[in-house]
A protein has these predicted regions:
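Small-residue-biased structural context
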Residues: 1-163
């Protein structure tokens, strides 16, 4: 039987992988093959994680009135993260502008996952029962696999993104 710590530990495992990819990307330079490959891996990982997290965790938390505001906040940040990834993908990796944007993205994304882990997950756990946990664990793993198979890098400048 799944427990609160299991689903949240699983999400934190993904976050740790994301932190490692961010660190590796910060160590790359210019329009290198390493930067391109790591950015593609990060993009697919983040997009699939966000979609699975929304379908497993956040859809459950939206049904719990005390956590609705926190949940909406996180989902809105997921949208901002995807826009930033698309903007980075549309920016020349060899330009100084790319690294500047990436450093801002790195800071914002780390803030997002720290907030989830330190504030939201402990709060959410108070409102979840074993049935919720089992459902979320099952949905997350299935959706993560499916979403990762479909995820792609989609270049789109922020100023061109539809609101």
């Amino acid at each position: 039987m799944a427990t609160a710590t299991e689903i949240f530990e699983r999400l934190k495992q993904d976050h740790d992988k994301h932190r490692a990819l961010l660190d590796k990307l910060l160590d790359t330079s210019g329009d290198s093959n390493d930067r391109e490959a790591l950015f593609e891996e990060l993009t697919k990982e983040l997009k699939s994680h966000a979609a699975a997290e929304e379908q497993a965790l956040y859809s459950t938390m939206l049904r719990k009135p005390p956590t609705t505001d926190e949940t909406r906040h996180s989902v809105a940040e997921h949208h901002e993260i995807e826009e930033a990834l698309n903007d980075l993908a549309a920016t020349d990796m060899s330009s100084g502008g790319w690294l500047t944007k990436f450093k801002t993205f790195d800071h914002d994304y780390r803030h997002h996952i720290d907030e989830e882990e330190e504030d939201h997950f402990p709060d959410f756990a108070k409102y979840l029962d074993d049935k919720d946990m089992e459902h979320m664990e099952r949905v997350f793993e299935r959706r993560k696999r499916e979403e990762k198979a479909e995820a792609e890098v989609t270049p789109e400048k922020k100023e061109d993104a539809k609101e």
